[in-house]
């Protein structure tokens, strides 16, 4: 940090984080800006995933309840239609096998169920992948922001020692600016990293529960399909 610029900030009596950023050393300024961007990015991902994962689980649960209550036709997909309901997509994935179940010969039952199982597995993987898309950014921000902030801290402390060496003075006016930069970089690194790590772990758990719910419903569908193929209408 430029000592004169820091002195001006104190003289004006209006010291703030923004002024510290504007008066910072170019390298530290780049670090601080990168951390601010990372923090904004992580909160954008957190907001989007909070609603995306919660909404996906709610819709899948609604279809599962409708299926067991005999109202699955309300969600039936027509050719060319798309849906954001994972439960409806699971049922659509085996719709052909579901229709054919009552007409295939006993020797074809195993092949029909195996084909349906592959379709369900692919659909579950695809749906979980769609909802989890972007969550890796939280892991990246959480693991790297602390080290980026640490780099800014080291650079700020180095500037403090350089100022001491150049001015042969250890007063607060000489070292205060670079030390403030160093602490600011550390703080921003933690501000960016901590929420990212917390929400990454939360969303990972939510996604695992979502995948387990879809897997359980897939197994229920396979059981019903197998019974339908063996016994006719249920």
Which ranges hold each PLM region?
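Residue-level signature of catalytic and energy-coupling elements of molecular machines
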Residues: 25, 43, 75-76, 91, ...
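Hydrophobic alpha-helical transmembrane segments of polytopic membrane proteins
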Residues: 179-198
């Amino acid at each position: 940090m430029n000592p004169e610029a820091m002195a001006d900030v104190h003289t004006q009596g209006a010291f703030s984080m923004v002024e510290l950023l504007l008066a910072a050393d170019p390298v530290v300024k780049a670090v601080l800006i990168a951390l601010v961007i990372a923090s904004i990015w992580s909160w954008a991902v957190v907001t989007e995933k909070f609603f995306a994962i919660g909404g996906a689980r709610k819709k899948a649960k609604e279809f599962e309840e409708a299926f067991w209550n005999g109202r699955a036709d309300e969600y039936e997909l027509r050719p060319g239609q798309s849906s954001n309901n994972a439960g409806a997509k699971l049922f659509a994935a085996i719709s052909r096998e579901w229709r054919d179940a009552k007409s295939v010969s006993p020797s074809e039952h195993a092949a029909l169920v195996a084909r349906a199982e592959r379709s369900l597995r692919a659909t579950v993987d695809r749906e979980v992948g769609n909802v989890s898309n972007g969550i890796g950014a939280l892991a990246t921000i959480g693991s790297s922001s602390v080290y980026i902030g640490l780099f800014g801290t080291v650079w700020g402390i180095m500037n403090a020692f350089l100022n001491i060496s150049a001015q042969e003075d250890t007063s607060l006016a000489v070292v205060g600016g670079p030390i403030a930069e160093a602490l600011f970089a550390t703080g921003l690194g933690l501000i960016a990293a901590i929420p990212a790590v917390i929400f990454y772990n939360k969303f990972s758990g939510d996604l695992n529960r979502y995948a387990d719910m879809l897997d359980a419903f897939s197994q229920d569908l396979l059981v019903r399909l197998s019974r339908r193929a063996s016994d006719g209408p249920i």
